[in-house]
């Protein structure tokens, strides 16, 4: 753990008397990709805010490597359509960035052709790459990517996942990625953490990229994708709380992959 870039210990967050996060244990090391998945309302955004230092947890602690450089890619960006803002001007909002640095970052993510385009005119996939380029301009040790493939088709998702992996390899940075997709995640993910206010389960995604049916479904992009099968031994009610007495009559029991309780 001494090599960790960031470490969360028993983190809990409460809003209006409701537990949004409870007893969260999480760490990210250099070169490690951790994918955080879970349904809407699971606390993923709250956890990201805690990681970024935008929110102080009510219980537990968040430790960061001293002077840690973080590159953050938001889930989406809304720009007023009447605002005259080119991609270059947007990237130059990062201190110390000139056209040369902006172009280099865009080339790294395969989006150099949009440098002079208005941000309102580029496609969703191009915007995701621009946001990723902006995160890279901070020369991050930790990349925090909030829904980096949102609004992108499966082929585009595979391309972005492959790009993120190459960036990790090139820069040696840790990656914390958030996803709403409960079953389809990066095959190069080192750890998948399933969150529903607490850590329901975590583990390595099963490598299914060689399965004929998977290859047929996703074609040449299959190696960049993987299915993660969840092994929960409990249920949640409509409010996200653990159901301690399911209909079967069995009590709530945590398995070996469950990181709480």
UniProtKB/Swiss-Prot annotation:
**Residues at which ATP binds:** 38-45
Q: What is its EC number?
A: 7.2.2.20
Q: Which UniProt keywords apply?
A: ATP-binding, Cell inner membrane, Cell membrane, Ion transport, Membrane, Nucleotide-binding, Translocase, Transport, Zinc, Zinc transport
Q: Which GO terms describe its molecular function?
A: ABC-type zinc transporter activity; ATP binding; ATP hydrolysis activity
Q: Show which residues constitute the signal peptide.
A: none
Q: Topology relative to the membrane, per the entry? A: Peripheral membrane protein
Enumerate the spans annotated as ABC transporter domain.
Answer: 6-221
Q: Which GO terms describe its biological process?
A: response to zinc ion
Q: Where in the cell is it found?
A: Cell inner membrane
Q: Which residues form a coiled coil?
A: none
* One protein family per Pfam: ABC_tran
Instruction: Give the reaction(s) catalysed.
Output: Zn(2+)(out) + ATP(in) + H2O(in) = Zn(2+)(in) + ADP(in) + phosphate(in) + H(+)(in)
On subunit structure and binding partners, the annotation says: The complex is composed of two ATP-binding proteins (ZnuC), two transmembrane proteins (ZnuB) and a solute-binding protein (ZnuA).
Task: Give the protein's biological function.
Answer: Part of the ABC transporter complex ZnuABC involved in zinc import. Responsible for energy coupling to the transport system.
Q: Which family does it belong to?
A: Belongs to the ABC transporter superfamily. Zinc importer (TC 3.A.1.15.5) family.
What name appears for this protein in its UniProt entry? Zinc import ATP-binding protein ZnuC
- Recorded source organism is Pseudomonas fluorescens (strain ATCC BAA-477 / NRRL B-23932 / Pf-5)
As recorded in Swiss-Prot or TrEMBL, the protein's gene is named znuC
């Amino acid at each position: 753990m001494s090599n960790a870039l960031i470490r969360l210990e028993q983190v809990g967050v409460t809003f209006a008397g409701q537990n949004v996060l409870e007893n969260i244990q999480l760490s990210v090391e250099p070169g490690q990709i951790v994918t955080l998945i879970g349904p809407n309302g699971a606390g993923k955004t709250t956890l990201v805010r805690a990681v970024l230092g935008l929110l102080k947890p009510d219980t537990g602690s968040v430790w960061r490597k001293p002077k840690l450089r973080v590159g953050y890619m938001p889930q989406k960006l809304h720009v007023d359509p009447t605002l005259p803002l080119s991609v270059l001007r947007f990237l130059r909002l990062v201190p110390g960035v000139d056209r040369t640095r902006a172009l280099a970052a865009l080339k790294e993510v395969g989006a150099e052709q949009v440098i002079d385009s208005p941000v309102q005119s580029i496609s969703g996939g191009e915007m995701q790459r621009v946001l990723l380029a902006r995160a890279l301009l901070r020369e991050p040790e930790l990349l925090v990517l909030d829904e980096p493939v949102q609004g992108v088709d499966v082929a585009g998702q595979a391309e972005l996942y492959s790009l993120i992996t190459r960036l990790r390899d090139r820069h040696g940075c840790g990656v914390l990625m958030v996803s709403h997709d409960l079953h389809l995640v990066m095959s190069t993910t080192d750890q998948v953490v399933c969150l529903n206010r607490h850590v329901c389960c975590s583990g390595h995604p099963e490598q299914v990229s060689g399965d004929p049916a998977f290859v047929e479904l996703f074609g040449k992009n299959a190696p960049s994708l993987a299915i993660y099968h969840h092994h929960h031994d409990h249920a949640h009610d409509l409010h996200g709380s653990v159901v301690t007495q399911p209909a079967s009559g069995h009590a709530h029991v945590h398995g070996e992959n469950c990181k709480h309780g």
